[in-house]
């Protein structure tokens, strides 16, 4: 099974990706984790990405596509995966579809963890990620509305979007997702 996790900042994408990985025995491909590791290790791509991440901006599409392509060709993803933090725009979704077609790995579902903006802010402020400061959170929420809403429409039109209420306790959200897959 190949899943894309979608949602605003603080919606639980990383948490639910981990839970689903345990339940479904699939690797999690976390763009946030890949970016943080590349920045921490000062890889050439990480050095290019760092200023965008620090501002809370989305990385340019060619840079994101390069990150994801490098990861999807690794051998642990052959039987399926959970992709968290990518795509973030409709253009990236189309590019991902082309890449997956080339790799023979079609996407099964895009899971949207739905919460409101106030909950996004509250949850983000209670995390301990290096880029979770008020200015970056506000920027990311703005980018979510600008870019991710059209992405949801893209997957809805392809009839592979599952919207899940992400307000309940973590384990309950996991159960809601598993019941829908």
From Swiss-Prot:
Pathway terms, separated by semicolons: Purine metabolism; AMP biosynthesis via salvage pathway; AMP from ADP: step 1/1
Span list, region LID: 126-132
Positions with a binding annotation for AMP: 36, 57-59, 85-88, 92, 140
Gene Ontology process terms (BP): AMP salvage; nucleoside diphosphate metabolic process; nucleoside monophosphate metabolic process
Gene3D superfamilies assigned: P-loop containing nucleotide triphosphate hydrolases
UniProt cross-references to CDD domains, sorted A to Z: ADK (cd01428)
GO cellular component, one term: cytoplasm
Molecular-function annotations in GO: adenylate kinase activity; ATP binding; nucleoside diphosphate kinase activity
Catalytic activity: AMP + ATP = 2 ADP
UniProt main location, coarse: cytoplasm
Alphabetic keyword roster: ATP-binding, Cytoplasm, Kinase, Nucleotide biosynthesis, Nucleotide-binding, Transferase
Keyword Cytoplasm listed: yes
Region (NMP): 30-59
InterPro entries tied to this protein: Adenylat/UMP-CMP_kin, P-loop_NTPase
Pfam families, per database record: ADK (PF00406)
Enzyme Commission code: 2.7.4.3
Annotated localization: Cytoplasm
Translocase keyword on record: no
Binding residues for ATP: 10-15, 127, 168
Subunit structure, as described in the record: Monomer.
Domain notes for this protein: Consists of three domains, a large central CORE domain and two small peripheral domains, NMPbind and LID, which undergo movements during catalysis. The LID domain closes over the site of phosphoryl transfer upon ATP binding. Assembling and dissambling the active center during each catalytic cycle provides an effective means to prevent ATP hydrolysis.
Family, similarity comment: Belongs to the adenylate kinase family.
Described purpose of this protein according to its UniProt entry: Catalyzes the reversible transfer of the terminal phosphate group between ATP and AMP. Plays an important role in cellular energy homeostasis and in adenine nucleotide metabolism.
Protein name: Adenylate kinase 2
Organism from which the protein derives: Synechocystis sp. (strain ATCC 27184 / PCC 6803 / Kazusa)
């Amino acid at each position: 099974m190949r899943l894309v996790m979608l949602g605003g900042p603080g919606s639980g994408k990383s948490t639910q990706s981990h839970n689903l990985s345990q339940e479904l025995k699939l690797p999690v491909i976390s763009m946030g984790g890949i970016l943080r590791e590349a920045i921490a290790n000062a890889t050439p791509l990480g050095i290019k990405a760092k200023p965008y991440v620090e501002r809370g901006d989305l990385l340019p599409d060619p840079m994101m596509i390069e990150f994801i392509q490098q990861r999807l060709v690794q051998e642990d993803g052959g039987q399926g995966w959970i992709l968290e933090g990518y795509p973030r725009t409709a253009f990236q979704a189309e590019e991902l579809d082309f890449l997956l077609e080339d790799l023979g790995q079609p996407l099964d579902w895009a899971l949207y963890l739905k919460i409101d903006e106030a909950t996004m802010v509250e949850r983000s402020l209670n995390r301990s990620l290096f880029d979770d400061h008020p200015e970056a959170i506000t920027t990311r929420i703005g980018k979510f509305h600008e870019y991710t809403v059209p992405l949801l429409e893209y997957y809805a039109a392809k009839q592979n979007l599952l919207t899940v209420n992400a307000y309940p306790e973590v384990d309950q959200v996991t159960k809601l997702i598993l019941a829908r897959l």
